Each structure stands twice: as C-alpha cells, then as structure tokens.
A protein has these predicted regions:
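Catalytic core of membrane glycerolipid acyltransferases/transacylases, capturing the structured
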Residues: 1-38
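Non-catalytic C-terminal accessory region of glycerolipid acyltransferases
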Residues: 42-193
C-alpha cells in the first residue's frame, strides 16, 4: 500500500511508532491512557483529521487493540471504540473497509490472558514474526459519505461499519462456487430476426 501511497498512515499503538522503519507511517496513540480527553488523545485526533482533510489516506483500527482468545475461542474484536467511530464520522470522507485474516502466536494469546500490558509489549515482535507469512487481506468497496450519513446514531453507524467489515471475512470461510463450475461459457446475445 505504501508503495502506491507513501502518504498513507495508520493510527496505532505508540510502541509501533518506536520501530524506526514504521515511524513515518504511524500516528501514535497511548492505549493505556484512561483519559480520553488527555493531551495525547486530543493531539492524535487533530492530526488524524488534518491528515484526512488534506486528502491523505488514514487507517484506523476501531477496536483499538488486537483480537484475542477468550474461553478458548478466538474473539472477533472487543466493541469498537466510540472515539474512533466519532473520528471516522467527523472526517466526512469515504470509508474503505479492510479485513485482515491473520493470527498471532500462541504466546501472544497466552500473554493476553495475563494482561493487556504484556500483550501490548509483545506486539512489535508479533509484527516481525509475520515477515514470511501470507496474510490474507480483503478490501471492500468505498462507502460514500451519503451512505454513512444514513445512520443517525453513533451506535447504528458503528454497527453498520462493523458489519461492512466483517462481511468481508465470509470470502475466507466459503469456497467460491463460480470457480468450481466446469465449462462455464458466457451467454451469447440473442440473434436479431
């Protein structure tokens, strides 16, 4: 993505911002900051909105953290952060949903059970452990501002964006039937008489 759009940035954990090759692509936020109105949060939101208003692309992970195991099962995401959804809505730009089909190491999920701090500290090494792995990504169609504005409450808007994103996961769970049909030929146009 950054080969095509070197101006692309993501809002991500400040620990990822400390990795030198990633610095120019990460707008850092502090997930441990309990005060949503703190200076670091306000600065991050202002920078994100400025970046978007200048026509540059921005990636946001609305859950604010990586999916983890709970009760032995992979959890999709925790509820998406209201603050992230408000930033997306306030930007008034088309939204492109993206679904990542990937897993982290068993150690990462084990540390998640112990605590958020350990899980977060493991993030940089998890990122580098993906180096030779194939990560499946599905990119959806842009959602227009008009379509977004049909959802009046933040809750409805968040649910709409979440559904649009997780609908992209279905392609990884089903085989494409069209590709398995033998001798599929395009229909001929009817002859004019």
């Amino acid at each position: 993505l950054v080969e095509k759009r070197p101006d692309y940035k993501i809002i991500a954990n400040f620990l990822l911002h400390r990795i030198v090759p990633l610095q120019k692509y990460v707008m850092p936020v502090n997930p441990f900051d309990d005060h949503k109105d703190s200076k670091s949060s306000v600065t991050g939101i202002k920078n994100a909105l400025l970046h978007l208003s200048e026509g540059y692309p921005l990636g946001i992970f609305p859950a604010g953290e990586v999916s983890t195991f709970k009760d032995g099962r992979l959890v999709v995401d925790k509820p998406w952060e209201e603050g992230a959804i408000k930033v997306i809505r306030k930007a008034q730009v088309p939204v492109v949903p993206i679904y990542f089909h990937a897993k982290n190491s068993q150690l990462f999920y084990f540390l998640s059970k112990i605590g958020d701090t350990l899980r977060t500290a493991k993030l940089p090494s998890e990122l580098f452990s993906q180096k030779d792995r194939v990560i499946k990504v599905r990119i959806g169609k842009p959602i227009s501002v008009n379509e977004q504005n049909e959802y009046k409450t933040i809750e409805d808007y968040s649910e709409f964006l979440r559904k649009k994103t997780y609908m992209l996961a279905n392609s990884f769970n089903k085989e494409n039937k069209l590709l398995t049909v033998p001798n599929l030929k395009p229909q001929k146009s009817p002859k004019k008489i």
